[in-house]
Amino acid sequence: MFRNLCLFALVIAGGSSAVNAQANAPSSAPISLEEAIRRAQTIETTYSAAVTESVVAQAQRGIARSALLPGVVFHNQFLYTQGQSIPGDQTPSHGGSTSSVRFIANNTVHEYLSQGIVTETIGGAGIADYRRADAEAAAAKARLEISRRGLVSTVVGDYYGVLAADANVAVANRALVEAKRFGKITRQREAGGEVAHADVVRADLQEQQRQRELNDAVLAARKARVDLGVLLFPDPTTAYTLTVGLDQLPPLPSRAEIDVAAKSNNPDVRAAFEVLRSADLEVTSARFGYVPDLSLNYYYGIDAPQFAIHAPDGSRNLGYAASATLDIPVWDWFATRNRVKQSTIRRTQAKAELTITQRRLLASLDELYQEASVSQTQMALLDQSVQTARESLNLTNLRYSAGEGSVLEVVDSQNSLVSAEVSRADGAVRYYVALANLQTLTGNMP
């Protein structure tokens, strides 16, 4: 029983104690919005996957470029072939350059090859593949920017969500203080015979309601801090403070500036365009399957019965050779035609995706700008509402103290002020999030 009473007392006192604990608990260095974004980029796995994809695409571009350049290898080989028996002499020869061998493809029983080989293949498919890899690398880079902007938008929402939650805690705490003050006034007036006991009961109910609201606000603030802490620290429960407030809102750029930035710096459109370019080059590469490839080879080294620069008779084994090969495609059972068909279908799909991406950009741009504009306008109205509600509460308290107002009027004024202050904090977050979402289309991110 004693334990249950202690737990109940802790719950009742939890709101104010949590606020004091937040004010007095040691915390890490203040974190700005830019620092929060930087930390999130080192932890968030989706962004890390986009970084990996971009790096891999850049490496693939280098591989495709290397395929266009001559390749050099140092080839070393030893061949042993069974010798051919000579009539009248059952002992096969094992060494001379004129020894007969059983496999006509080989030159002698012992053959040593040590050569530097330079190989170059000239074909349109290789050039198209390189340009395609370049387009895919550009598309991966654009997708990385999409992921970065999405992460920034998430961090901005969570960052200002924490600020709004802290503001709601402050509002709930002030409301509790006001409710306690009003309860004290009602009890004093009841003792003086000025009001009925019903006013005291109503004031007590109001105080209890404010205590519950403070407890809920503290819990919501704790959850908001943990949600942001997941993106900032290995331990999400690490204490921290934020450097930005909700008092000074950044200005909203003009619609003309937004339109220009969105057309020139939108990663979604850029990624879709690069995907289309890659698909177009894939068609070109597939069509080069109908065109011959020219291979050039140059050899320098030895191909001799001895592993030596000079033969036993003093002649030099070192020498060079060159070859040119032209492979003309004749018949491949329609494999090339099917590859062209596949790539053409993918190109058509890429064109459709680019078109719908451009349409979505126009629609999202208008929608998000209107959201940010309305949010900015409402912030001025919310500021006026807070001032009006605060003035109304002061006047109502004076009327009640003078015996001209009722307890219900005071309670209603208190509720109006709390609602206005909470709405202002939520309105500030709404504007920041709307501005961040708009900036994801224009590239003007922190």
Task: Please give the residue ranges for each predicted region.
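Periplasmic alpha-helical coiled-coil/stalk elements that build and connect Gram-negative outer-membrane
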Residues: 150-263, 371, 375, 416-417, ...
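A glycine-/polar-enriched beta->alpha junction
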Residues: 38-48, 55-71, 115-132, 142-149, ...
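Short segments within alpha-helical structural elements
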Residues: 66, 209-236, 386-444
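Amphipathic alpha-helical coiled-coil scaffold segments and their short linker/junction regions
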Residues: 37-41, 93-101, 195, 199, ...
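Small/polar, glycine/serine/threonine/aspartate-rich low-complexity segments that form flexible
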Residues: 23-29, 75-122, 241-255, 280, ...
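Bacterial Sec-pathway N-terminal export signals of envelope proteins
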Residues: 21-77, 83-85, 112, 236, ...
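Bacterial N-terminal signal peptides
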Residues: 6-15
